[in-house]
Structure formats: structure tokens, C-alpha cells
Amino acid sequence: MSEMTPREIVHELDAHIIGQQKAKRSVAVALRNRWRRMQLDVDFRQEVTPKNILMIGPTGVGKTEIARRLAKLANAPFIKVEATKYTEVGYVGKEVEQIIRDLTDIAIKLTREQQMGKCRQRAEENAEERILDALLPKPKNDWESTETDSSSNTRQVFRKKLREGQLDDKEIDIDVAQPQVGVEIMSPPGMEEMTNQLQSLFKNMGQAPAKRRKMKIKEAFKLLIEEEAAKLVNQEDLKEQAIEMVEQHGIVFLDEIDKICKRGETSGPDVSREGVQRDLLPLIEGCTVTTKHGMVKTDHILFIASGAFQMSKPSDLIPELQGRLPIRVELDALSANDFKRILTEPHASLTEQYIALMNTEGVKVEFSESGIDSIAKAAWQVNERTENIGARRLHTVMEKLMEDISYEASEKSGSAFVIDADYVSAHLDNLVQDEDLSRFIL
């Protein structure tokens, strides 16, 4: 779990996302509150529920990017899902409880990596012994099995060479466990327990014996470490810790929530809109979900929802769902100055990416101040005249601008290009000024 302060979280987000300070502060405080809650007494801790967030803002302003970067900072089970992928219970499609099942699978993987990391040293020792056994086979007869000083010394010599990497390219025959073939069964609602039993049955049937393989010691060592570490992990403890991690630290990011708003008077069942909203209510409020790893309570899982709300309003969500998303954050539309900052300030910005890509061909590309101003202005103008798709417009404009250089780069190794205002004007002015061309090309 992340122990970063809100200011540190915002600083990390600033390295990748321009502006939107209100949204950054809200998610930073929400993430820090997860840590604060865990410092309370156990009894009092149960009373402190997370304050779920609804982020509202036009497309391309950073809502999804905030989620992506937050996932890396959280160091906790985190899942980002699109609300449009789910349907009401009883209809064909994913039901919303699948979100928690997927989140639990993520927690299992996270916990397994942590536990394997703790026992890695012991796993390395065991793997080392298995490789030495393959290099120096033990005698099969009892009268030869007594270890002599010379055989012990030989083993130590090989151990030293192995640790120094002198034997990395030597090939050996070792027995490696075969990967298990998983069988995924789609279960109807309420029959998850039977599905879990069937999956366990297929899992046991699919266990293949270890297979002898010939490989280099360097590759064998990596495989054997993973195999030995997996043996040292207690599966029951793993499941308990993972479920605890989901219940106490889990975060769900619900994207495109505006797409499940009811629009106008429609007849017939609203399978993937209002029905999904109703199914989300108990999940966000707190309920128990059956997963193949055990029962998971959702009372303290943090939900962050986001939507553009261009065709609808937050008030179009059913009132009960609005009440369960108490913190509202509005993200601002991007200006030409924001576009300019997006092109230069973030870590691995768009301009840096193109410079690095062309550098692989031996072509030097430089973006002047006037060139960056012109690119930002062009993207902003197209957004104003046509559909406003936010910062995503920069990708389209940059790709069109760099098209000629990218195409000819392989034949122009050693060349240098300066992208200034004149270059941008020559390549983009016709497209920006002509509204019809802008609609179809940019």
C-alpha cells in the first residue's frame, strides 16, 4: 500500500498530466485516506467508509490518464473498467460483480509476487542445489553415496563458478514442471460455487508430470527459481491475504459512466444502462461477492467514476447512485497554452517520443519554440471548429506533421530537421483552415 503524502502523489501525477489540479488533489487525498484509515483502531476502522469520487470533464482532458498513473502509485489492487461492458443480471454479457472477481485475481497476483519476493533467497539456494545436482549427479549405488572430501570440494568449485556466471552458457538436462492449462467456465448468476468446483476438477486433471528439458544454465536458473518460489508459497495464506488486501485497499475506476445514463423516454428493458446502474448500487454501498478465491466484502473498496457527460448530465444518473458518489470533481477543458505544455513538460512527452524514434534511424529532429506554439495552436483550432477531443488531437496533428520525415527517415540517415513555425505552416495550414479537410484528416 502506498504511503505517499497527497503532495507527493500530486507531484508524481504532475510529471505525466498537465493541469487538472482539483482532480489530482481529490484522488491524492482519497489515496492517502486509505493509509490513514489503516492507522485507526480495528473497531473504529470499520466505521470509516471511503468517499467515492465522480470526475466530470470533456473527453481527452486527463481522466483516464489519472487512473492509469494512479494504478502505478497505489501499490494496491487496482482495476480500471468501462461501465459500458456490463449488462443487467440475467442478460447475456458481463455482470457488474465480475469487476470484484477481476480485482481479486489482480490481488492474488500481487500477493503472490510479494510472497515469492520474500522467499526468493531460499528459492535461489534450492535452485542452485538442483543445478549442481544436474552438473554432478549423485551416485546411484549405496556404497558410492558416501560423500568424500574430493567430491565436496568439486561441488564447491562448481558452486563458485555458477555464482560467478562462468557456467551460464553450459547446457544441462533438468526436470521442469509443465505449466497448468487453465479452463475458464462462464457461470450463470448464483452458480459460482459449482463453477469453482468444476474448475478445480479440470485443474487437477490437467496436472502434467515434470518434463526433462535441455537448456542453458542461465535460463534454467531463472525457471527453477520461479518453480522453487512457487513451492514455498502457502496457497491458503495467499488467498486470505489477497482477499484482505482487496477489502481494505482495493480501488475500482469506473470509466465512461455517462454512457450508462438513461437518455429520454425509451421503451423496453434498458439492459446496459439503468439496469447496470441499479446493479452497481449494492456493489458501491457494500455487499458480499462470491469469487473462486472466497467471499469478498466491498464495504471499504474505493470507487472512482468518470465520464464526459456530453450527451447527458450527472443528474441523469439514478439518484441512489449519485448519492453514493459524494465527491464531484470537474476537469477543465484544455487551452492552447495547455497543449503547448503537454508537448514539452510531461515525462516522455510527444515531442521527446518523436525525437527518440527518429534518432534510431540516425535522423536528428529538433522542435523550436515557434514550432511548438504553432502545433499547439493548430490542435486547439481544430478542436474548436470540429469535435473537441482534447489532448488526443495532438496525436493526430503530430502524426500528420511528422508523416514525411517518418517515411523518408530510413533513407536520410545523418540528416537534421528543425520543426519551426514555417515547417508547421507549410504542412498543416491547408488542413487547419479547410474545415471539411479538418473533419476527415485531423
From Swiss-Prot:
Region (Disordered): 137-156
Subcellular location: Cytoplasm
Residues that bind ATP: 18, 60-65, 255, 320, 392
Domain of life the protein comes from: Bacteria
Annotated keywords: ATP-binding, Chaperone, Cytoplasm, Nucleotide-binding, Stress response
GO BP, sorted A to Z: protein unfolding; proteolysis involved in protein catabolic process
Cross-referenced PANTHER family: ATP-DEPENDENT CLP PROTEASE ATP-BINDING SUBUNIT CLPX-LIKE, MITOCHONDRIAL-RELATED, ATP-DEPENDENT PROTEASE ATPASE SUBUNIT HSLU
NCBIfam families in UniProt: hslU, PRK05201.1
Similarity comment: Belongs to the ClpX chaperone family. HslU subfamily.
Name assigned to this protein: ATP-dependent protease ATPase subunit HslU
